[in-house]
Amino acid sequence: TAFPEIPKTSLQIKYVPEEMQEHLSPAFYMIPAIDYTEENVIYVNQIQMRDDLALFTTLAHEGYPGHLYQTIFFESTNPDPIRSILNFGGYVEGWATYAEMCSYYLMPLSKTQAAILQKNSSVILALYALADMGIHYEGWSRMDTIEFYARYGIKDAKTVDKIYNLILGS
């Protein structure tokens, strides 16, 4: 199989409280306590879930085979305790993004549809990464960011404004 079996674990799906919805990401996995990984929680932000596809790929990123799977599998290898306190952000997000990209091919879609959606998602992530470097490294202004996205056909100022503010906050 693509993903080795993991020990039995439990998962609770909770919803982001209404008061916090506009400030939080589409979903997030709460990493369990280092000494008790049997209880896992994923919070879903309902206002960010446009459709079943978004929900499916988000849960793949946050749950199985994403963050939840990676956490439970890693802990089942009995790692040196120091590995559980160190943060490897690129590795963790890289794995979850890989899992999310794989999830397009697990949906009831044709292989062509899955490939188009997966590649579109990859391009969007690449545009975010380029904008992040432009804003934080090259000092892009809001207008620079709007011009950057316009070159890729994204011309809605409100959308680019949201992206700009999101990147500034990260």
Question: What positions do the PLM features span?
Answer:
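Long, His/Glu/Asp-enriched segments that create or flank divalent metal/ion-associated functional microenvironments
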Residues: T1-S170
